[in-house]
């Protein structure tokens, strides 16, 4: 355990007692370093290990929660309005050179909190990215999409208009929602509660997936919870109840595609040829 992690872990045991006036300088410095590391992409709340499994760094989530205890609300100037919050906006001190160096686009109306990382090639339409989130290279966050606290978004992902990717700071033991590389999430879909959408998936418009949602593979009859297998094309559907008197909502895997096919075939064609 690093010294930085140790300071944060120990402080979190007494989080309810910490206030902006009684916090030690060492703790402030540790939390600031952790938030800055998240902001720059040096640290990530979740990352893959050598076995390809997602590992959650709970101490970084604790650092985010501690930052709320350390800071009072202040007035934050914005282009069109003012804000009153404990967390500054990410771009508050950016100039032209900083934006060029970072290498992403942020159109008017995009709100990003400090402590989230935006990679090169990202396009942020009017959207919201919360603290602790990570957005990978080449990803599009479309209009009114929301990337929740600590969510992990892979490379070359398209989050369509109105998509909601759930955040998770409390309960602390819950895992962040993860969207793998090269995924397409259709308009107004919601992926929440630490669900993992693996690489190369296509989620159709208006699909809602949480930990209790049945994810039904129509080819095999298998049912998944909390994980969409790589290369899945998913639409909304329903399954009959045990008594057979009614149907309940589910997500349906209608087909699988490999990376080569996904690269050659348009998204709309994949979604339209599901029969």
UniProtKB/Swiss-Prot annotation:
What's an example GO cellular component term for this entry? cytoplasm
PROSITE patterns, alphabetically?
HEXAPEP_TRANSFERASES
Q: List GO BP terms, alphabetically.
A: diaminopimelate biosynthetic process; lysine biosynthetic process via diaminopimelate
Annotated substrate binding lies at 105, 142
The pathway that the record names for this protein is: Amino-acid biosynthesis; L-lysine biosynthesis via DAP pathway; LL-2,6-diaminopimelate from (S)-tetrahydrodipicolinate (succinylase route): step 1/3
Q: What class of enzyme is it?
A: transferase
Reaction equations catalysed: (S)-2,3,4,5-tetrahydrodipicolinate + succinyl-CoA + H2O = (S)-2-succinylamino-6-oxoheptanedioate + CoA
**Protein keywords:** Acyltransferase, Amino-acid biosynthesis, Cytoplasm, Diaminopimelate biosynthesis, Lysine biosynthesis, Repeat, Transferase
Q: Which InterPro entries match?
A: DapD_Trfase_Hexpep_rpt_fam, Hexapep, Hexapep_transf_CS, THP_succinylTrfase_dom1, THP_succinylTrfase_N_sf, Trimer_LpxA-like_sf
Q: What is its EC number?
A: 2.3.1.117
Q: Which Gene3D superfamilies match?
A: Hexapeptide repeat proteins, Tetrahydrodipicolinate-N-succinyltransferase, N-terminal domain
Signal peptide residue numbers = none
The places in or outside the cell where this protein is found are: Cytoplasm
Q: Which GO terms describe its molecular function?
A: 2,3,4,5-tetrahydropyridine-2,6-dicarboxylate N-succinyltransferase activity; nucleotidyltransferase activity
What quaternary structure, including any partners, is listed in this protein's UniProt entry?
Homotrimer.
The family this protein is said to belong to: Belongs to the transferase hexapeptide repeat family.
**The protein, known as:** 2,3,4,5-tetrahydropyridine-2,6-dicarboxylate N-succinyltransferase
Q: Which organism is it from?
A: Histophilus somni (strain 2336) (Haemophilus somnus)
């Amino acid at each position: 355990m690093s010294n930085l992690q140790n300071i944060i872990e120990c402080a979190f045991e007494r989080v309810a007692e910490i206030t902006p006036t009684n916090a030690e300088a060492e703790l402030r410095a540790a939390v600031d370093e952790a938030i800055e590391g998240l902001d720059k992409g040096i640290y990530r709340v979740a990352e893959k290990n050598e076995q390809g499994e997602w590992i959650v760094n709970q101490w970084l989530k604790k650092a985010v929660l501690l930052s709320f205890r350390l800071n009072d609300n202040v007035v934050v100037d914005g282009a069109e309005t003012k804000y009153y919050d404990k967390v500054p906006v990410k771009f508050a001190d950016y100039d032209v050179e900083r934006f060029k160096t970072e290498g992403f686009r942020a159109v008017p109306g995009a709100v990003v909190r400090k402590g989230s990382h935006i990679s090169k090639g990202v396009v942020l339409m009017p959207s919201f990215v919360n603290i602790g989130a990570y957005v990978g290279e080449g990803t599009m966050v479309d209009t009114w999409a929301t990337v929740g606290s600590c969510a992990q978004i892979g490379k070359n992902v398209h989050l369509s208009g109105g998509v909601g990717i759930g955040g998770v700071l409390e309960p602390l033991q819950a895992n962040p929602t993860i969207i793998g590389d090269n995924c397409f999430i259709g308009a107004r879909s919601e992926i929440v509660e630490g669900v993992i959408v693996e690489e190369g998936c296509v989620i159709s418009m208006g699909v809602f997936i949480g930990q209790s949602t049945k994810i039904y593979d129509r080819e095999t009859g298998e049912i998944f919870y909390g994980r969409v297998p790589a290369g899945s094309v998913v639409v909304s559907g329903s399954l009959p109840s045990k008594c057979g008197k009614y149907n309940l909502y589910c997500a349906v895997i209608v087909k699988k595609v490999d990376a080569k096919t996904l690269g050659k075939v348009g998204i709309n064609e994949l979604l339209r040829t599901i029969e």
